[in-house]
Amino acid sequence: MSFRALSVFSLFLSYLILGSAEQCGRQAGGALCPGGLCCSQFGWCGNTDDYCKKENGCQSQCSGSGGDTGGLDSLITRERFDQMLLHRNDGGCPARGFYTYDAFIAAAKSFPAFATTGDDATRKREVAAFLAQTSHETTGGAGWAAPDGPYTWGYCYNRELNPADYCQWDPNYPCAPGKQYFGRGPMQLTWNYNYGQCGRAIGVDLLNNPDLLATDPTISFKSAFWFWMTPQSPKPSCHDVIIGAWSPSGSDQAAGRVPGFGLITNIINGGLECGQGWNAKVEDRIGFYKRYCDTLGVGYGNNLDCYNQRSYNNGPSVDSM
């Protein structure tokens, strides 16, 4: 037996012996490890190469940096954040004053692989893509002649307008009495089972306290990062797509699903926006993305839309949350 095989076997054996180790990944409903630890192929948390290297089967938070933002605050400074989300604190925005730069940076510390993987262009492109998709979800610039253009009005809302309960029976994540699970936060997370999974991953009881996504800005950003960083089979994570770590399977290729910003739209809201030809919502997402890429001085990459992509049929997304 090689040293590598022995190492993996020993690691697996230790999991059987140490039943108290914290679970994560597909073995634990997509849960993330606390403190930015890596999730191994076996669903346990740690910070060594056996846990953290992709080639060793790492499932999430694979940088192993233990919570460092890796220079995110230099990649996107407070001034640049304010420039990109220019009108988020406008008097007409219901969420004015909520989405702060400090909360954005603090939340990112729980997801150390965000915008720290790859070269400078890849890191900037991930920031642009994340802010673009979440800006579309929270935009206040649609449907009127918005000053400075519609793509300066992201992060205007933190609650869904005219919401329903979004409660569906689930044995693992039952709805709490009197609670509603409508869209909240940058990614507008919906449905009780998504609140439950997200809360479990970030260590917050969101089933009983769903409104934390609209009252605590750091937790709110964490919910969006959780969605961004977490794969939900058969969907890859948005993170893996934008950094180039995902390759389409045969079924993906047959469905026209190719790497690029457009696939992220498919992951988030493909059931309503993809595979149907031109779509104004897809164009809005692309508009935000191009503006943010231009602001950060990085190219857009290929395959920006999902017009010819079939949507995924399962896994959490904005259209199925």
UniProtKB/Swiss-Prot annotation:
It comes from Theobroma cacao. InterPro entries: Chitin-bd_1 (IPR001002), Chitin-binding_1_CS (IPR018371), Endochitinase-like_sf (IPR036861), Glyco_hydro_19 (IPR016283), Glyco_hydro_19_cat (IPR000726), Lysozyme-like_dom_sf (IPR023346). Induction: In response to infection, elicitor, ethylene, wounding. Its EC number is 3.2.1.14. Disulfide bonds join C24-C39, C33-C45, C38-C52, C58-C62, C93-C156, C167-C175, C274-C306. It is an enzyme of class 3 (hydrolase). GO terms for molecular function: chitin binding; endochitinase activity. Residues 1-21 form the signal peptide. It comes from the Eukaryota. One of its GO terms (cellular component) is vacuole. Belongs to the glycosyl hydrolase 19 family. Chitinase class I subfamily. The keyword Amino-acid biosynthesis does not apply. Residues 65-98 are annotated as: Hinge. The keyword Membrane does not apply. It catalyses: Random endo-hydrolysis of N-acetyl-beta-D-glucosaminide (1->4)-beta-linkages in chitin and chitodextrins. Keywords: Carbohydrate metabolism, Chitin degradation, Chitin-binding, Disulfide bond, Glycosidase, Hydrolase, Plant defense, Polysaccharide degradation, Signal, Vacuole. Defense against chitin-containing fungal pathogens. The lineage of its organism: Eukaryota, Viridiplantae, Streptophyta, Embryophyta, Tracheophyta. One of its GO terms (biological process) is polysaccharide catabolic process. Residues 22-64 form the Chitin-binding type-1 domain. Transmembrane segments: none annotated. It is found in: Vacuole. The active site is at E137 (proton donor). This is Endochitinase 1.
